[in-house]
UniProtKB/Swiss-Prot annotation:
Keywords: Mitochondrion, NAD, Oxidoreductase, Transit peptide, Tricarboxylic acid cycle. Optimum pH is between 6-8.5. CDD domains: MDH_glyoxysomal_mitochondrial. It is found in: Mitochondrion matrix. GO terms for molecular function: L-malate dehydrogenase (NAD+) activity. This is Malate dehydrogenase, mitochondrial. The gene is mdh-2. Disulfide bonds: none annotated. Substrate binds at R108, R114, N146, R180.
Length: 341
C-alpha cells in the first residue's frame, strides 16, 4: 500500500480537509488503525472494537475496508466504527485521532528477515506519516510495521521534516516480544502466565531482542543452559511462526493481541492512568544509540519517563552491547531512506 507522500498529502488537501492539531477528547478516545484489512489489522480491529475505552475506531486500508468495518460494526460494544479506503480518505481516518496504530505493510515469508521487508514497508510508513503530520500531529503513533528498528526512525524523520516531531509520541511496538517471553518462561517454569512479567529491551529483530531474564517477576532462577536456549528462542520466535505457517503468513494473531494490549496502555495513559510498558522509542537509556526499547512510563503525553534497562546480568550486558551496532545500522538505514526520498 505504498503511495508517494505527495500523492497522499495532495489527496487530503483536495478533499477540502485542513490540518488541525486538536485531539479527540481524552474521555472519548479515537483510535485509527492503518492497515485494518490485513492479516494483523483484522484481528487487531476485532480486539480494539471490544476495548471499552475506545469510543471511535477508524479503519483505514487501500482496499476492503468497508467489509471489515461492516463486520466489526455488528459487534455489540460501544466503539463507533468508520471505514476509510484509499489515499483520499486517509486524512479523515487519522484526523484528531488520539492513538494511531500502524500494522500496514507486507508480511514476512519463509526465508525472509524483517529487514527484507524494508523496501516495501519503508515507503508505506513514510507516506502514512506524511499525512499524520498534517492531520493529527499530536497523536500517539504505535508502529507495528516491520522492520520496526527502521520504521520508527522513518516516521520520526518525516515528522521532523514537517516540524511536528515529539519523541514522546512515537513508539515501536515490541509488546509481542514481551508476550512471547512471558509465555515461554511460564511454560518452562510452570508459572501463571498472567502473573509473569519479563522485560524485553533493545529492538525488535534478531539479536536486538534482549529478554532480561534476570528481572523476571516473580523472581525466578534460570540455569545457564536454560538461558542459552530461551534467549535465542525468544529472538527467533517470529521465524518459528513464519516457518510453521509454511508460506501462509507471519505472526498475525499474537501480534494483534500485543498491538491491542499496547494501544490500550496508550489510551489508559491518555486518560490519566499511568502504566509501564516496554517500547522502542527515542531514548538515551543506552549510550551510543538513539532509539532503544526499555520499560517506559506512559501517561497523557505519551512517554512520561524512560525507566532504562535497570540492573542486568553480565550475559545480558553483553547482549545489549552487541545490539548497539546492529541497531545503529537499522536506524541509519531508516534515516537515509527519508533523506534520500
Amino acid at each position: 500500500m505504498s503511495l508517494p507522500a505527495k500523492t497522499l498529502v495532495q489527496a487530503a488537501a483536495n478533499s477540502g480537509l485542513r490540518a488541525v492539531s486538536v485531539r479527540h477528547s481524552s474521555q472519548a478516545p479515537k483510535v485509527a488503525l492503518l492497515g485494518a484489512a490485513g492479516g494483523i489489522g483484522q484481528p487487531l480491529g476485532l480486539l480494539l472494537k471490544q476495548d471499552p475505552l475506545v469510543a471511535h475506531l477508524a479503519l483505514y486500508d487501500v482496499v476492503n475496508t468497508p467489509g471489515v468495518a461492516a463486520d466489526l460494526s455488528h459487534i455489540d460494544s460501544n466503539a463507533k466504527v468508520t471505514a476509510h479506503t484509499g489515499p483520499k480518505e486517509l486524512y479523515a481516518a487519522v484526523e484528531n485521532a488520539d492513538v494511531i496504530v500502524i500494522p500496514a505493510g507486507v508480511p514476512r515469508k519463509p526465508g525472509m528477515t524483517r529487514d527484507d521487508l524494508f523496501n516495501t514497508n519503508a515507503g508505506i510508513v513514510r507516506d502514512l506519516a506524511a499525512v499524520i503530520a498534517k492531520a493529527s500531529p499530536k497523536a500517539l503513533i504505535a508502529i507495528i510495521t516491520n522492520p520496526v528498528n527502521s520504521t520508527v526512525p522513518i516516521a520520526s524523520e518525516v515528522l521532523k521534516k514537517a516540524g511536528v516531531y515529539d519523541p514522546k509520541r512515537v513508539f515501536g511496538v515490541t509488546t509481542l516480544d514481551v508476550v512471547r517471553s512471558q509465555a515461554f518462561v511460564s511454560e518452562l517454569k510452570g508459572h501463571d502466565a498472567s502473573k509473569t512479567v519479563v522485560p524485553v529491551v533493545g529492538g525488535h529483530a534478531g539479536i536486538t531482542i534482549i529478554p532480561l531474564l534476570s528481572q523476571v517477576k516473580p523472581s525466578t532462577k534460570f540455569s545457564e543452559e536454560e538461558i542459552s536456549k530461551l534467549t535465542p528462542r525468544i529472538q527467533d520466535a517470529g521465524t518459528e511462526v513464519v516457518n510453521a505457517k509454511a508460506g501462509a503468513g507471519s505472526a498475525t494473531l499474537s501480534m494483534a493481541l500485543a498491538g491491542a494490549r499496547f494501544a490500550n496502555a496508550l489510551v489508559r495513559g491518555i486518560k490519566g492512568e499511568k502504566n509501564v510498558q516496554c517500547a522502542y522509542v527515542a531514548s538515551d537509556a543506552v549510550k551510543g544509540v538513539e532509539y532503544f526499547s526499555t520499560p517506559v512510563e506512559l501517561g497523557p503525553n505519551g512517554v512520561e519517563k524512560i525507566l532504562g534497562v535497570g540492573k542486568v546480568s553480565a550475559y545480558e550486558q553483553k547482549l545489549i552491547d552487541a545490539s548497539v551496532p546492529e541497531l545503529n545500522k537499522n536506524i541509519a538505514k531508516g534515516v537515509a531512506f527519508v533523506k534520500g526520498n
